[in-house]
Structures are given as structure tokens and as C-alpha cells.
Swiss-Prot record:
Organism (species): Pseudomonas aeruginosa (strain UCBPP-PA14)
Source organism phylogeny: Bacteria, Pseudomonadati, Pseudomonadota, Gammaproteobacteria, Pseudomonadales
Protein's UniProt name: Di/tripeptide-binding protein 4
GO biological process: dipeptide transport; protein transport
PANTHER family reported in the protein's UniProt record: D,D-DIPEPTIDE-BINDING PERIPLASMIC PROTEIN DDPA-RELATED (PTHR30290:SF38), PERIPLASMIC BINDING COMPONENT OF ABC TRANSPORTER (PTHR30290)
Gene assigned in the entry: dppA4
Function of the molecule: Part of the ABC transporter DppABCDF involved in the uptake of various di/tripeptides. Prefers dipeptides with acidic residues at the C-terminal end. Efficiently uses tripeptides.
GO MF, any single term: peptide transmembrane transporter activity
Keywords assigned: Peptide transport, Protein transport, Signal, Transport
Keyword Transport attached: yes
Length: 533
């Protein structure tokens, strides 16, 4: 445990004192933008939570090549797919070790039982661990995995077979996503026997590059390098996520060397940061969408005319110029960026037309509309200045006769309340997890996701659902593209969102940091990162 005196010292100084006791310890401090919601990753969809668990503690059967959306082997060293696309057989790496900690000491290596435990926990309501996910299986349910997966079978100690009820084009990509992280069945059995199921969300065990040490909410998460990592021990010895909500403070810390990596600077600061000889700025056209979900279950927001009016009232260009700055984001028209399959370039964005908005509101009997917008109290790559965006929306809506109240909430609280349907509007962002269009649509716009609350527009449209489902089942890219183009027409006409932006992704690091790769999927993995003396 950290000495009481050290708790009151700045993070960098505390690390320096620790390093003095450990001579050549190599530390990496990353300034992150928010606290993780927990560490039982199957319960959550937030990118911050995935970085703190899936990218550090856990692995999946498959992985993405760093900096790309190419699927590569993970815990499975190879796989076979049946000719009918209904059977996927994964061959596990031998000798992969789970973490050894003060609270768990494994007696065996990874095997098929761990894969079965992981997926049957979510699939089977009678599984002894099923009810332990107090927030449910957010991604799993939103993507319809329960109805997709017919069975998960143990072929032998190192072979697992998934049998599907229907073909699923993005299934291999899905198996590389955070929600598919593989847990230790032995650790689960230990906690269950002790009646300590809640510990899984506070003290995770995985096979990943870093071993969890401790978490201080809104302060830091600490890890040590996994000496037994199957891909080789990471170059650094200690990894610290220093939770720093204010992007200005994050930049001050990286300039001062208190952090070696600082995530998500304000776009307007990027040109100045690039001029600092001690810093390097990484940027990429990421798979990101910024949007405002409109709660279609609240009257009169259940009327598409009202939702269209809200879209028409917004001066989107002015907002993007002010919030993101020149060249840092392009206007969003649909639910996913134009780099993905089936983006419909023929759809024209809603123009800024407050008079037409007023007319639609009058036609719908929704004049003098009063609604509430939820925003986060920190920043993120999808929305670098939530308060400014909210204020600009408020002013634009007022010109159309709509009174908007703004509520600023801590990120975890915003997600909790929005998923419970308390909002009228909620300012959100989505980071693609696998490079497939379905990853934007199913978790955020499907009927299953509306029921679970992940679809925060609570929009369930049978025509959209049918197109999306068919696109998942066909393997031909051209046919899938046509289906997605049609689905986007339905989305545009029904207007469950205000699509705002497709932002670029920026991260800042000291130029002594090597081996860090910025990812279009917005995940941050430090397994290969090193720091020069």
C-alpha cells in the first residue's frame, strides 16, 4: 500500500520516491480524461473503462493490429470458419498465464474452460455469475449476441467452438472487442465460494500486459507490468493512469513532465503543442462520431417532426468551428464516418433553418417546447468543450422557440441517468471498436439496445432494424453497403439523433516516449511503450 505521506505528494514526486527505492524502475504516467466506471468490462461500453481494463488487464481471442482495424491472433493463435459461416473454431495458445496477485494465485494456465465461463456467464441466465453484472451485459445484449450464439463448446483443453444461429459478417471483429475479454474461471470460482462476487469489478484478473494494483476514484489507477505476458513483458515496469478531467491541466502536466502521455488535448491547442520541442503530437482520422441522442420515448420527442425541427434549429457549422476549431472535425450527417463501408454520400445534412423548425413544431403541436440536455463535466475526443457546445445549442434552439435547460454531470452519472431514460437530449460520442458499420448501429440504434438503455435515443424502428439485421447476415461487401445506405436514409428521416461531428483524434506525449501507436479505434494500449531516460 502507498505510504500515507506519499498520498499527499504530487503524482510525479511520489513516483520518483518509489523509483528511488526500486533503482531502475521504469514508469509511465498517462493523464487520462475520466474515471473508469469499473473493471468488469462486460458491464460497460465507455472507452475510458475499456482502456483501464480491456487494454491493460485483459486479452481477447482475437486482437487488432496496432494502428489498424486488421484482425490478428490474440489468445487464439489460429481459427477456422465453416463453409456455411455458422461455426467458428478457435485454437488457444498453450501456456498463457493469468495474473498472480495478493488476492489470487492461479494454479493453471488459460484453457477452454475460461472461454466457456466468460461467454456462458452472459449467455445463460442460470449461470452462477450471470446476475453479478449489476449493470447487465451492455455490449453483449445491444449487439444481440444472446440470439446470435447458439452454443459455445469445449472441443478439448485448448480448442473452443462457437456455433451461431445465423451467419454474422462481423463476428471475428466482434471477438476482438472489449466486451469479449476472457476471464479466469478459476478466479470466478474462488470469489463465488467466498461470496465476494463484487470483487470482480474492483480487483480484476486477466492475462493482459499489466497487472492491476489499485484504484483511487477520480485520482489514479496503478498497474505493474506482467512478467509472464505471452507477448513478452512490457518495456515499462509501472503504469499509472492519472485521472485529470481538465484538458488544460493535462497539458500543463505533460509539459512539466508529470505525465509522459496526455490524452485528448483541445484541438485549438494542437498547433501550439506541435511547436514544443519536448513534445510529439499524434493524430489520426479516427472512427468517432459526436452526436446528441434525442429520447424518442419522451413526448413530444416521439414525433419525428419535432426531432427534425431540433436538427434544423442547430447551426452546426458554427458549433464545429467554435468547439473543434478549423480542420479538427467534419460535420456528421449519419451515425458513422465516411471511411466505413456503406456510408451514404447522397444524404444531405439538415440545413440551419430556424423558421422551418418553427413551422414543424407548430405542425406537430409542440410550440413552446421545454427540454433538458445532459452533458459531461469533463472533455473527451468526441466533445472537447461540452459546455460551449451546449450553450450554442441552447441559443440556436431559443431562436426556434425551444427552451433548453443544461445539466452538467460526471461522466459515469451521465451514462447511468441517460441509460435510465431520464434525459430529453444527451450529448454523447461513440468510438468505433472494430471497424465495421454494425459496431456503430447495433450498440446505439438497435431495438435490443433501446430495451437495455444503451440506445440512448430509445429508438426502435422496424425498417431500420430489418436492414441492419440483414446487413449483418450477408458476407458480400457490395450487398452489405447497399443495405447500410438504405438504413441511413431511414435514420435521417426519423432523426433520432442530432449527428454533430466526425472528429480527428489527437494525443500528446513527451518525445522520450517510444512505441506508442495511436489507434483509429480510439483505444490506448501501452504494452509496447517505452520511455527513454
Amino acid at each position: 500500500m502507498l505510504h500515507p505521506l506519499l498520498r499527499h505528494l504530487p503524482l510525479a514526486l511520489a513516483l520518483a520516491l518509489c523509483a528511488a527505492g526500486a533503482a531502475q524502475a521504469k514508469n509511465l504516467v498517462v493523464c487520462t480524461e475520466a474515471s473508469p466506471e469499473g473493471f468488469d468490462i462486460v458491464q460497460y461500453t465507455g472507452a475510458v473503462t475499456a482502456d483501464a481494463s480491456a487494454e491493460t488487464v485483459f486479452n481477447r481471442l482475437l486482437a487488432f493490429r496496432p494502428g489498424t482495424t486488421e484482425v490478428i491472433p490474440g489468445l487464439a493463435e489460429r481459427w477456422d470458419v465453416s463453409a456455411d459461416g455458422l461455426s467458428y473454431t478457435f485454437h488457444l495458445r498453450p501456456g498463457v498465464k493469468f495474473h498472480t496477485t495478493d488476492y489470487f494465485k492461479p494454479t493453471r494456465s488459460l484453457n477452454a474452460d475460461d472461454v466457456l465461463w466468460t461467454f456462458q456467464r452472459a449467455l445463460d441466465p442460470k449461470h452462477p455469475w450471470h446476475a453479478s453484472a449489476l449493470r447487465g451485459y451492455a455490449y453483449f445484449d445491444a449487439m444481440g449476441m444472446g440470439e446470435l450464439i447458439k452454443s459455445v463448446e469445449k472441443v478439448d483443453e485448448l480448442t473452443v467452438r462457437f456455433v451461431l444461429n445465423r451467419p454474422e459478417a462481423p463476428f471475428l471483429r466482434d471477438m476482438a472487442m472489449p466486451f469479449a475479454s476472457i476471464y479466469s474461471a478459476e478466479y470466478g470460482d474462488q470469489l463465488l465460494a467466498a461470496g465476494k462476487q463484487g470483487q470482480l469489478n474492483n480487483q480484476p484478473i486477466g492475462t493482459g500486459p499489466f497487472v492491476f494494483k489499485r484504484y483511487a476514484k477520480d485520482a489514479q489507477v496503478r498497474y505493474t507490468a506482467n512478467p509472464d505476458y505471452y507477448a513478452g513483458k512490457p518495456p515499462i515496469d509501472n503504469l499509472v493512469f492519472a485521472i485529470t478531467l481538465d484538458p488544460n491541466v493535462r497539458m500543463q502536466k505533460v509539459r512539466a513532465g508529470e505525465c509522459q502521455v496526455s490524452l485528448y488535448p483541445k484541438p485549438e491547442d494542437v498547433p501550439r503543442l506541435k511547436q514544443d520541442p519536448n513534445l510529439a503530437v499524434d493524430e489520426i482520422d479516427a472512427l468517432l462520431t459526436t452526436y446528441i441522442a434525442i429520447n424518442t420515448q419522451h413526448k413530444p420527442l416521439d414525433d419525428p417532426r419535432v426531432r427534425q425541427a431540433i436538427n434544423l434549429a442547430l447551426d452546426k457549422k458554427a458549433m464545429l468551428d467554435a468547439v473543434f476549431g478549423p480542420g479538427a472535425a467534419s460535420p456528421a450527417v449519419g451515425p458513422y464516418p465516411p471511411t466505413l463501408l456503406g456510408y451514404n454520400h447522397s444524404i444531405q445534412d439538415w440545413p440551419h433553418d430556424p423558421e422551418r423548425a418553427r413551422a414543424l413544431l407548430k405542425e406537430a403541436g409542440a410550440e413552446n417546447l421545454r427540454i433538458t440536455l445532459f452533458i459531461r463535466n469533463g472533455t473527451s475526443p468526441t466533445i472537447p468543450n461540452p459546455a460551449l457546445a451546449a450553450q450554442m445549442l441552447q441559443a440556436d434552439l431559443a431562436k426556434a422557440g425551444i427552451q433548453l435547460t443544461i445539466r452538467s454531470l460526471e461522466w459515469g452519472e451521465l451514462l447511468k441517468r441517460s441509460k435510465a431514460g431520464e434525459h430529453d437530449l444527451s450529448l454523447l460520442g461513440w468510438a468505433g471498436d472494430n471497424g465495421d458499420p454494425d459496431n456503430f448501429l447495433s450498440p446505439n440504434l438497435s431495438c435490443a439496445a433501446a430495451e437495455s438503455g444503451e440506445n440512448q435515443a430509445r429508438w426502435c424502428d422496424k425498417d431500420f432494424e430489418a436492414l441492419m439485421r440483414k446487413a449483418r447476415e450477408v458476407s458480400d461487401p457490395a450487398e452489405r453497403a447497399k443495405l447500410y445506405e438504405q438504413a441511413q436514409v431511414v435514420f435521417h428521416e426519423q432523426a433520432p439523433w442530432i449527428p454533430l461531428a466526425y472528429p480527428k483524434l489527437f494525443n500528446v506525449r513527451r518525445n522520450t516516449v517510444q512505441g506508442y501507436v495511436i489507434n483509429p479505434l480510439s483505444n490506448n494500449n501501452f504494452a509496447t511503450t517505452s520511455v527513454k531516460p
